[in-house]
Amino acid sequence: MEKLRCAVLDDYQGVSTRLADWSSVSRQVEVTVFREHFSDEEELVAALSLFDLLVVMRERTPFPKALLERLPRLRLLVTTGMRNASIDVAAATARGVTVCGTASATEPPVELTWALILALARNVVGESTAFRQGGPWQHSVGVDLHGKRLGLLGLGKIGSRVARVGAAFGMDVVAWSPNLTDARAAEVGLTRAASKEALLEASDFVSIHLVLGERSRGLVGRSELARMR
């Protein structure tokens, strides 16, 4: 029996074959990994036209209705994580394409969030670059997190865990989202900001933890950044 053809897109880090176990489907599925991003739609369609299954890395390549209509062989579209706003699920379903996701954990994004915050506060990148280029040694002074205000846009599973770490550092943590209530904020032990603008104006650090969608797209732009202190 001819094998089904599966393509993995935008695997910049080469993790799909290194961290995932494909052994259970190796006899039925032939896997091709594309590590480089296809920025041109014509090139993308040409590359994917012969594949039955696609695996996408988050929102790196959107799949709107127009693109799905140009992939007649496609039967299954898998995204890392359970939600991907860049896939037109309704259009895929109408064409008989099954869309599904993989299980995800909250710990990795929380850890990455704090790695980025700490690197920024302590100027880790600048100091490392200076060290590697021959100096100057210790040319900047870091910023303490204790006593600073952390503003969270979004207080779901990830945001609430980020909040707990912030509290452990002795930070004043506030949160805001379109649907956040005082009761939900109190459950996590913090205060709900009166508005997005109020949060931005009073926070030393801001971290966004909202699902990408029409309501959250462009949430922070030039005018919002100008409000930050």
What kind of region is each of these model predictions?
Residues 37, 61, 105, 130, ...:
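Residue-level "edge-of-site" marker
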